[in-house]
């Protein structure tokens, strides 16, 4: 990473993490529920999703202030999905980001409800915590985009399709369809949300939608690669869990080298799409490289 990207990520990450805690601390709820929600929100992580929202605003030369609550909303949804993914009825993981998973600390029932709370409260950040400069129409568009990305047409539907694909061989087309919904759509929302807040032209938004699909699939391919050759200490969870759970992955379908080539193809296409837009490209190019080369 260049000094520019390192500085950008470090400065904004602190802001995002602080605001996630502030938003949640202010909510009126049972103490046990608040502790469970904060436990997972404060467990670390890349904060890549909110940082993408801010990076797109930055690329258009616009203020990042309204990107913070919108980015935090996405991070809350991402965190809820991790809590639920780790449950015994799903992936049955005991470790997340180097710490015991939420249900191991607070019990399954509280973990489920903490996830429910994070999902529900996330939308309030968009409707009530952005500035008055963001019109009601724009807020509604953001909410609708987020519902499509996180709900049955996106992440939730993708998770079900992923579960149904276990213990059987799927085609590459099926695998990409699963991860387009399970992973790429929520990452894609971050790109689109930044563009909407920046008042980007509709033509740009459609190009960015395709761009986000490529980085989303690329992100998943890198995840699959790390599950084979990553460091458990850096990843913060068990390595090899995809194989243990008999999941189809890009390396299992294409070989490890084939998956790395596929990742390279997606990242190059994402950069090509950005190259045709009238915005500051350097930061987005570097984010593409970060997605392709990350070690956790």
From Swiss-Prot:
Binding site for isopentenyl diphosphate: 46, 49, 78, 97
Keyword annotations: Cytoplasm, Isoprene biosynthesis, Magnesium, Metal-binding, Transferase
Pfam families assigned to the protein according to its UniProt record, in alphabetical order: polyprenyl_synt (PF00348)
Free-text comment on the cofactor: Binds 2 Mg(2+) ions per subunit.
Leader sequence residues: none
Cofactor entry: Mg(2+)
GO biological process assignments: isoprenoid biosynthetic process
Matching InterPro entries: Isoprenoid_synthase_dom_sf (IPR008949), Polyprenyl_synt (IPR000092), Polyprenyl_synt_CS (IPR033749), Prenyl_diphosphate_synthase (IPR053378)
Cell compartments where the protein resides: Cytoplasm
EC number: 2.5.1.10
Highest rank taxon of the organism: Bacteria
Family: Belongs to the FPP/GGPP synthase family.
Descriptive protein name: Farnesyl diphosphate synthase
